[in-house]
UniProtKB/Swiss-Prot annotation:
GO terms for cellular component: mitochondrial inner membrane; respiratory chain complex IV. O2 binds at Y244. The chain crosses the membrane at residues 16-36, 57-77, 78-98, 101-121, 146-166, 182-202, 234-254, 266-286, 309-329, 337-357, 376-396, 413-433, 451-471. It is a multi-pass membrane protein. Fe(II)-heme a binds at H62, H377. This is Cytochrome c oxidase subunit 1.
C-alpha cells in the first residue's frame, strides 16, 4: 500500500497526493494568516510582544505556503494531473515517472521552508526576499539560505511538471482532438509555458543572492559594484508571470463550471483562448510596475503603466464572455456555480484596483500600503481560491465517487464569501489612509477597520474548518456520484471526464478514444 503512493506513476494517484499536500499546506498557511490578523486586531503589541522580525517571518511563511505549496500544487498538480489526461483522452501523462518526482520534490521543499522559520531568527524578508535585507549583513543565520533552497526545489518541481504538461498536450491527444478543444486544457498548457519560461530567471536571481551571502560575490552589493535593483528586476520578471500562473488554471476551471451550470457552450470560445494567450504573453512585459518607486526613468514608467493597463483588455474579454455565457442560460446555482459567480464578482473588483495601481503616479502613494494587500488578496484569496473551491466541488464526485452534500457546500460558500470580503474590503480604506504593509503595529487612527478585518478573518477560519467538515461528510456519507452528476442538456455534449465511471478506473482509456 505504501509503495502504491510512494512509487506511483499514475496521474490520478499523483493528482490526489498533490491535492492532499495542497490542503495540508493551505491549513498551515491559514494558521499563519490568523496569527497576522490577531496581531493586527488592535493597536499595540498583541501576541508577538513587539517582535517585528517574527511578524515578518510569519508574513513570509504565509506567502510562500499559500503560493508555492497550496495554490500551485492544488490547481496545476492536483486538478491538472487528474483531469488534463482524461480531458484529452490520454491514458496518462507523457512522462509518468517525471510526474512522480515532480510531486516528491515538494515535501522536502516544504520541510526546508519550515526549517528556515525555525532556525536562527527566521527569514523575515517578505516573499520577495529583497537584498540588502536578505543579505548576510542583515540576515546573518542560515534562514534565508534554507528558504532559497526550498524555492529551488519547488522551482525544479514546477519546471519538470511544466515540461510534462507541455509534452502531454502536444503528443498524447486522442485521434481527432485538435489543440483547440477544451479551455481547462488550454489553461494548464499556457500556465506550463509560463512556468517553464519564468522559473529559471527566479532560480538565477536567488542563486546570485545565495553566492552574495555565502561566497563573497557582489551581484547585489553596491560596495562591490553590484546593484540591489538588479535583483528586483530578476525577481519580478518571475514574480509577475507567477501571479498569472496562479490564476490562469482557475480561468480554465471557471470556464468549464459556468458552461456546465448555464447549460450552454462557452461564449466566444476562440476569444477565450486568445485572451488567455495574450494574458500569458503580456504577463512577461509588465514586471516593473512593481518597481515604480525605485527611481525608473519617466519614459520607462510611462511604458509600464500603458502595458499593464493593456492586460485589462483580455481580462475584460474573459469576464464579459463568462457573463455572456450565463446570459440566457438555464442557470443552476449549485455550489461550484456559486463559487464561479463569486469568482467573477470578486476577481472583477480585484482587477479594478489593479488598474488603479497600474498608474505610476498613483502607485507612488499606494506602494507598500494595505491598498496593494487588498488588491492582490482580491485576485488571489477570492480569485484563485474561489476557482480552487469551484473545481473541488465540481470534480470531487468524479475523484472519489462520492458526491458532496449540496446544502453544506452552499453554507461553506456563504461563510467564505462573507469572511473574505469583511477581511479584505476594509484594507482598501486602510491603504488610502496610508497604513504601511509588513508592520505589526499601527497608529490608533487605523484601529477601526483593522478590527473589522480581523473579525472577517475569524469568519474565514470558521469557513475553512467547515470546509473540512464538508470533506469529512462527503467521504463518510456514501452518497454515490453518478457518471455525470450535472445532468447536462442534450445539446451540450459533456467533456470526456463525465463519460467515465465515478471514480474512474485506475487505467482509463484502455482503448483509443475516437
Amino acid at each position: 500500500m505504501v509503495t502504491r503512493w510512494l512509487y506511483s506513476t499514475n496521474h490520478k494517484d499523483i493528482g490526489t497526493m498533490y491535492l492532499i499536500f495542497g490542503a495540508f499546506s493551505g491549513v498551515l498557511g491559514t494558521v499563519f494568516s490568523l496569527l497576522i490578523r490577531m496581531e493586527l486586531a488592535q493597536p499595540g503589541n498583541q501576541i508577538l510582544n513587539g517582535n517585528h522580525q517574527l511578524y515578518n517571518v510569519i508574513i513570509t511563511a504565509h506567502a510562500f505556503l499559500m503560493i508555492f505549496f497550496m495554490l500551485m500544487p492544488a490547481l496545476m498538480g492536483g486538478f491538472g494531473n487528474w483531469f488534463l489526461p482524461i480531458l484529452i483522452g490520454a491514458p496518462d501523462m507523457a512522462f509518468p515517472r517525471l510526474n512522480n518526482i515532480s510531486f516528491w520534490l515538494l515535501p522536502p521543499s516544504l520541510l526546508l521552508l519550515v526549517s528556515s522559520a525555525l532556525v536562527e531568527v527566521g527569514a523575515g524578508t517578505g516573499w520577495t526576499v529583497y537584498p540588502p535585507l536578505a543579505s548576510i549583513a542583515s540576515h546573518s543565520g542560515g534562514s534565508v539560505d534554507l528558504a532559497i533552497f526550498s524555492l529551488h526545489l519547488a522551482g525544479v518541481s514546477s519546471i519538470l511538471g511544466a515540461i510534462n504538461f507541455i509534452c502531454t498536450v502536444f503528443n498524447m491527444r486522442a485521434p481527432g482532438m485538435s489543440m483547440l478543444d477544451l479551455l481547462f486544457v488550454w489553461a494548464v498548457f499556457i500556465t506550463a509555458w509560463l512556468l517553464l519560461l519564468c522559473l529559471p530567471v527566479l532560480a538565477g536571481g536567488i542563486t546570485m543572492l545565495l553566492t552574495d551571502r555565502n561566497f563573497n560575490t557582489s551581484f547585489f552589493d553596491p560596495a562591490g559594484g553590484g546593484d540591489p535593483i538588479l535583483y528586483q528586476h530578476l525577481f519580478w520578471f518571475f514574480g509577475h508571470p507567477e501571479v498569472y500562473i496562479l490564476i490562469i488554471p482557475g480561468f480554465g476551471i471557471i470556464s468549464h463550471v459556468i458552461a456546465t451550470f448555464s447549460k450552454k457552450p462557452i461564449f466566444g470560445y476562440l476569444g477565450m483562448v486568445y485572451a488567455m494567450c495574450s494574458i500569458g504573453i503580456l504577463g512577461f512585459i509588465v514586471w516593473a510596475h512593481h518597481m515604480y518607486v525605485v527611481g525608473l526613468d519617466i519614459d520607462t514608467r510611462a511604458y509600464f503603466t500603458a502595458a499593464t493597463m493593456i492586460i485589462a483588455v483580455p481580462t475584460g474579454i474573459k469576464i464579459f464572455s463568462w457573463v455572456a455565457t450565463m446570459w440566457g442560460g438555464s442557470i443552476e446555482l449549485r455550489t461550484p456555480m456559486l463559487f464561479a459567480v463569486g469568482f467573477l464578482f470578486l476577481f472583477t473588483v480585484g482587477g479594478l484596483t489593479g488598474v488603479v495601481l497600474a498608474n505610476s503616479g498613483l502607485d507612488v502613494a499606494f506602494h507598500d500600503t494595505y491598498y496593494v494587500v487588498a488588491h492582490f488578496h482580491y485576485v488571489l484569496s477570492m480569485g484563485a481560491v474561489f476557482a480552487l473551491f469551484s473545481g473541488f466541488y465540481y470534480w470531487i464526485g468524479k475523484i472519489t465517487g462520492l458526491q458532496y452534500p449540496e446544502t453544506l457546500g452552499q453554507i461553506h460558500f456563504w461563510l467564505m464569501f462573507l469572511g473574505v470580503n469583511i477581511t479584505f474590503f476594509p484594507m482598501h480604506f486602510l491603504g488610502l489612509a496610508g497604513m504601511p504593509r509588513r508592520i505589526p503595529d499601527y497608529p490608533d487612527c487605523y484601529a477601526g477597520w483593522n478590527a473589522v478585518a480581523s473579525y472577517g478573518s475569524y469568519l474565514s477560519i470558521t469557513a475553512v474548518l467547515f470546509f473540512f467538515y464538508v470533506v469529512y461528510k462527503t467521504l463518510t456519507s456514501n452518497e454515490v456520484c453518478p457518471r455525470n452528476p450535472w445532468e447536462t442538456t442534450p445539446g451540450v455534449s459533456p467533456t470526456l471526464e463525465w463519460m467515465l465511471p465515478s471514480p474512474p478506473a485506475f487505467h482509463t482509456f484502455e482503448e483509443i478514444q475516437v
